[in-house]
Amino acid sequence: MASPATSSAVLVVVLVATLAAGGANAATFTITNRCSFTVWPAATPVGGGVQLSPGQTWTINVPAGTSSGRVWGRTGCSFDGSGRGSCATGDCAGALSCTLSGQKPLTLAEFTIGGSQDFYDLSVIDGYNVAMSFSCSSGVTVTCRDSRCPDAYLFPEDNTKTHACSGNSNYQVVFCP
């Protein structure tokens, strides 16, 4: 039989592990710019947006409880020190850190996470602005290099473009793969 001290220590370890799991991330998104030009990726509802020079990577830790979101690249952007400005494509109300979806045209990575299975896709329904690939750690890579992209949603009822992967997967978005 365990001593009271041992039982208390085990209980503390279990409580700490439970609390740590409650604050865990639902997924990690690694976004890389392989283009020869700067891309300003945006992510909603988490992440916001940043400037990525060629070769740079941005990592987003999506918190548990997030059920879906979008990632896209913006091009031709100019922002001031307060994060206000504009982009030629994918602009989100003139903000560097997006809280709204981007404006057409934009190549869009979409995800639904949580539970035992996640879903993800690329879409060019709202236009095409930059080549992109999107993959999860346990699924296939979907790639879009032009506006006639066979791996992406081309119209809303195009229900053959969604891909599944096991829950708790991590994701990679690459611009100009």
From Swiss-Prot:
Induction per the UniProt record: By pathogen infection.
Keyword terms: Secreted, Signal
Domain of life per record: Eukaryota
Subcellular location: Secreted
Pfam families tied to this protein: Thaumatin (PF00314)
One GO term (biological process): defense response
InterPro entries: Osmotin/thaumatin-like_sf (IPR037176), Thaumatin (IPR001938), Thaumatin_CS (IPR017949)
Cellular component aspect of the GO annotation: extracellular region
Signal peptide annotation: 1-26
Family: Belongs to the thaumatin family.
PANTHER family according to UniProt: OS03G0233200 PROTEIN (PTHR31048)
Protein name: Thaumatin-like protein
UniProt organism field: Oryza sativa subsp. japonica (Rice)
